[in-house]
């Protein structure tokens, strides 16, 4: 955390958000997801250590972590895959802890994912966001995401 002068006799504290790609699932990562996932979804339980390990080892997905003061405060999953017309990417499961919102973690996570996708040949990056997530939707639009005229369909395989 740094304090910087931004006007005559005015200072503000600047918080440094660090973004890293998760390569090892340890207790800290498991505990972070136990805290984060309920803030993202009321209907899905947090992933187990084994499920997180499968995610981290998958060649099709990259798990980004946001850290504030050395503590995991957010995550984003980037899924990348090839289709006949090129490499595509999807941003999924973006969540920032309530206590860390407003410090740029969401934007930093998304920018890291966009940079990674571009560096790895993706030609588009898509995401979905519920309309009720107003702050997230404003962020995505501010970052340059465009709302698409498209129908999104889901087929439930459970049961």
Where in the sequence are the language-model features?
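Conserved GNAT acetyl-CoA-binding A-motif
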Residues: 110, 117-129
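A short helix-loop-beta-strand connector motif used in the catalytic cores of GNAT acetyltransferases and
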Residues: 54-65, 85, 90
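A conserved beta-turn-beta hairpin within the catalytic core of GNAT-like acetyltransferases
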Residues: 81-91, 101, 148
């Amino acid at each position: 955390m740094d304090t910087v002068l931004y006007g005559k006799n005015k200072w503000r504290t600047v918080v440094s958000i660090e973004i890293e790609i998760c390569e090892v699932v340890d207790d800290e990562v498991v505990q972070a997801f136990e805290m984060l996932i309920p803030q993202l979804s009321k209907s899905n339980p947090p992933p187990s250590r084994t499920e997180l390990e499968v995610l981290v080892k998958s060649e099709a997905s990259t798990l980004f972590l946001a850290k504030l003061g050395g503590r995991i405060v957010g995550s984003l999953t980037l899924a990348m895959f090839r289709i006949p017309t090129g490499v595509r990417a999807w941003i999924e499961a973006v969540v920032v802890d309530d206590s860390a919102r407003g410090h740029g973690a969401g934007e930093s996570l998304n920018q890291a994912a966009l940079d990674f996708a571009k560096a790895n040949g993706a030609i588009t990056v898509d995401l979905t966001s519920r309309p009720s997530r107003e702050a997230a939707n404003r962020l995505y639009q501010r970052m340059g995401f465009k709302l698409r005229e498209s129908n999104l369909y889901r087929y439930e395989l459970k049961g």
